[in-house]
UniProtKB/Swiss-Prot annotation:
One annotated Gene Ontology cellular component of this protein: cytosol
Record field: transmembrane: none
Protein's recorded name: Lysine--tRNA ligase
Required cofactor(s): Mg(2+)
UniProt keyword terms in alphabetical order: Aminoacyl-tRNA synthetase, ATP-binding, Cytoplasm, Ligase, Magnesium, Metal-binding, Nucleotide-binding, Protein biosynthesis
Superkingdom of the organism of origin: Bacteria
Secreted in keyword set: no
GO terms (BP aspect): lysyl-tRNA aminoacylation
Binding locations of Mg(2+) 2: E423
Binding site for Mg(2+) 1: E416, E423
Pfam family, one: tRNA-synt_2
Organism in which the protein naturally occurs: Prochlorococcus marinus (strain MIT 9313)
Length: 508
């Protein structure tokens, strides 16, 4: 930041500190304990829409909010007051305010208000309603009270925060000047409530599981590691809620879910944040086909509640979330896109050579045809799946917690839901055979010992739970942040997380 700008900001802050001191000496704040509002700005706008131009309504109202703009013209002034619900104009008339001040009914005079209260300050006012000759509903102020003095200027109301990263670092400023950002987080809150309500209405029970875990499992991801001092024990922030929710199914809860935070020590992008929110759902006596139906019903219902329809627009593209959605197997989609039939490949070298021949990158760490199939899908297919598509039947090598397919050797009963080229949900017919599960986790542990930091370890307590007996179960995980991105037309996950993790700011 240029030195001249820093100097100007420092001078402005000093001026505002002087005003704060002046208000304090007048007995008016500058930091109040409380204020009793009779209405929100939205209530006033809605309830008095019939007030004609030039008319007053002798109804005393009290309203509080932040001063967004101010215009002082001699003995008149006009302020714009904003609260969470909207804005309203304050009509400030010297004679009216000074008359109230002389009767000791108010906290200050017109001159004190117009010289000591700046844009950014929080104030509470009491007055009557009038509609100006220009048609603007206004509160004709009689009394005013400073509630909190702002020592920093607001961003320019016309240009907002031009620096996108500053919007994320100082979200409070972004929310002040951007109605779109406020609407995004309002929709997020409504969406989370709607998801919980939908599940609760269908007899699913939300039960919290540990965030700190002795063994990180339930996903192929690197965990964050911490340490418990009293127990002298390494612990991990959870990378999924899956294994503990399955324990609850073993214990007799037939419909269970948890909506909460997940932590993965991985890269950041427009689609990834190390701390994110998911909902995992488990239903006894169900399989992955049942979970497809549940996913369609849940997402389409919530979309209708939040967006008003199952047809929405995302980044200029119309998306139709009306069920039923397309279903296609991974190997069929790859074959359509590349001409390669991975189900016919029995040899890793042959599959790798075929991938290279059609221009696909062959990762050096791939050690099976199944992993190459998944790699080909990610490179050649994933971004093309714009309309909601269930991608079915994944390779067993990349799905250690999913049940083997009932009729397709080498595959598991798993789907991922893709919308606008992004994975939005993941589900299995859950693996409930404890012996099969042990073999797969031991294979994962061998991969981890060989250097794969995303591979699972062996969770002996989870295996013990499976040996007690788990009923046939369908499991589902939905990424809340990506769903919010879709429902709010947001291009980056940072737009829908109030305080995303960012790189340290460079000091100049």
């Amino acid at each position: 930041m240029a030195r001249s700008v820093l100097s100007a900001l420092s001078e402005l802050r000093e001026t505002r500190l002087e005003k704060a001191q002046a208000l304090k000496e007048l007995g008016n704040g500058p930091y109040a304990l409380r204020f009793e509002s009779s209405h929100s700005t939205a209530n006033l706008q809605a309830d008095h829409a019939d007030l004609a131009k030039g008319e007053e309504r002798l109804l005393t109202v009290s309203v509080a909010g932040r001063v967004m703009t101010r215009r002082v013209m001699g003995k008149l002034a006009f302020y714009t007051l904003a609260d969470e619900t909207g804005t309203i104009q304050l009509y400030l008339e010297k004679a009216t305010i000074d008359a109230a001040a002389s009767n000791e009914l108010a906290s200050g005079t017109f001159v004190q208000l117009t010289t000591l209260v700046d844009a950014g300050d929080w104030i509470g006012v009491t007055g009557v309603l009038r509609r100006t000759d220009r048609g603007e509903l206004s509160v004709k102020v009689q009394q005013w009270q400073i509630l909190s003095k702002s020592l920093q200027p607001l961003p320019d109301k016309w240009h907002g925060l031009a620096d996108v990263e500053k919007r994320y670092r100082q979200r409070y400023l972004d929310l002040i000047v951007s109605p779109q950002s406020r609407e995004t987080f309002r929709r997020r809150a409504l969406m989370v409530s709607a998801i919980r309500r939908w599940l609760d209405d269908r007899a699913f029970l939300e039960i919290e599981t540990p965030v700190l875990q002795a063994e990180a499992g339930g996903a192929e991801a690197r965990p964050f590691i911490t340490h418990h001092n009293t127990l002298d024990l390494p612990l991990y922030l959870r990378i999924a809620t899956e294994l503990h929710l399955k324990r609850l199914v073993v214990g007799g809860f037939e419909r269970v879910y948890e909506l909460g935070r997940i932590f993965r020590n991985e890269g950041m992008s427009t689609r990834h944040n190390p701390e994110f929110t998911s909902v995992e759902v488990y239903q006894a006596y169900a399989d992955y086909i049942d979970m497809m139906v549940l996913t369609e019903q849940l997402i389409s219902s919530v979309c209708t509640q939040i967006c008003g329809s199952t047809r929405i627009t995302y980044q200029g593209i119309e998306i139709d979330l009306t069920p039923p959605w397309r279903r296609a197997s991974m190997h069929e989609l790859v074959q359509e896109a590349t001409g390669l039939d991975f189900m016919g490949f029995k040899d890793l070298a042959v599959a790798a050579s075929a991938m290279a021949r059609v221009g696909l990158e062959v990762p050096s760490k791939a050690d099976s045809v199944g992993r190459l199939l998944n790699e080909a899908f990610e490179q050649a297919v994933e971004v093309s799946l714009i309309q909601p598509t269930f991608v079915l039947d994944y390779p067993i090598e990349i799905s250690p917690l999913a049940r083997q397919h009932r009729s397709k050797p080498g595959l598991v009963e798993r789907f991922e839901l893709f919308i606008v080229g992004r994975e939005t949900a993941n589900a299995f017919s859950e693996l409930i055979d404890p012996l099969d599960q042990r073999q797969r986790l031991e294979a994962q542990q061998a991969r981890r010992q060989a250097g794969d930091l995303e591979a699972h370890g062996v969770d002996e307590d989870f295996l013990q739970a499976l040996e007690v007996g788990m009923p046939p179960t369908g499991g589902l995980g939905i990424g809340i942040d990506r769903l919010v991105m879709l429902f709010t037309d947001s291009p980056s996950i940072r737009d829908v997380i109030a305080f995303p993790l960012l790189r340290p700011e460079l000091k100049t």
